[in-house]
C-alpha cells in the first residue's frame, strides 16, 4: 500500500467523527505526509471547504484548499456548462455561501422565493425546514425545472449516531413528487 503516490481519503468517519480525530488515520497521514500526496474528499456540503482545511489543520494535518474535494466543484461546472443561472437551493447557509462565492453570476434564490428557478439543488441541509421542503416539492412538480443533488448519502456519521443526509431527502422528494435527481455529483456517482 505504501508504494502508492496518492491517497484520497474520505473525511467524515475516516479521518474524524464530528470533531474527534480518528487518531490512527491522523497518525498515518502525518507519518507519510512528505512521501504520499494526500487529498481529502467529503460529500458533506453543509460545511465550506475552508472549514475542512481549518479542522484538519487543528488536527496537525497541513491541508490546503486545493487538497479538498467536494461535489460542489462538479455541480458548479454542470450549472455553468448547461447555462443554469437561477437555482432554488435545499441546503444550509454555508452551502448557499459556497455557491455564491464559487459562481458569483448565479442567482441563488432566497428561501421562500421560487419564481424563476431553473433548478432545485439538493444538498445536505442541517437547517432544513418544512417551508424549504414545500417550495422545492412544488418546483419539482414542473418537469422544466432541473433536479440536481450534490450526493446520495442516506446518512451522515456523527458522534451521536447516523443523521439523515441528502439521500434521505432524495427519498422524501421522490415519494412526494415522483422525481429522482437528473444528476448526482458526489461519490459514488460519476
Describe the function of each predicted region:
Residues 1-11, 15-190:
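HAD-like aspartate-dependent phosphatase fold
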Amino acid at each position: 500500500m505504501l508504494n502508492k503516490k496518492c491517497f484520497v481519503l474520505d473525511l467524515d468517519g475516516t479521518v474524524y467523527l464530528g470533531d474527534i480525530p480518528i487518531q490512527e488515520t491522523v497518525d498515518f497521514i502525518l507519518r507519510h505526509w512528505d512521501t504520499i500526496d494526500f487529498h481529502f474528499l467529503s460529500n458533506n456540503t453543509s460545511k465550506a471547504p475552508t472549514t475542512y482545511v481549518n479542522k484538519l489543520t487543528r488536527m496537525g494535518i497541513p491541508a490546503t484548499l486545493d487538497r479538498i474535494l467536494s461535489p460542489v466543484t462538479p455541480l458548479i461546472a454542470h450549472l455553468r456548462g448547461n447555462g443554469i443561472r437561477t437555482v432554488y437551493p435545499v441546503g444550509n447557509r454555508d452551502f448557499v455561501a459556497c455557491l455564491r462565492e464559487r459562481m458569483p453570476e448565479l442567482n441563488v434564490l432566497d428561501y421562500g422565493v421560487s419564481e424563476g428557478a431553473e433548478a432545485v439543488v439538493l444538498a445536505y441541509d442541517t437547517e432544513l425546514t418544512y417551508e424549504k421542503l414545500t417550495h422545492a416539492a412544488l418546483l419539482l412538480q414542473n418537469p422544466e425545472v432541473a433536479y440536481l443533488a450534490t450526493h446520495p448519502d442516506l446518512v451522515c456519521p456523527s458522534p451521536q449516531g447516523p443523521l439523515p443526509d441528502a439521500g434521505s431527502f432524495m427519498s422524501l422528494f421522490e415519494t412526494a413528487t415522483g422525481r429522482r435527481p437528473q444528476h448526482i455529483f458526489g461519490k459514488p456517482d460519476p
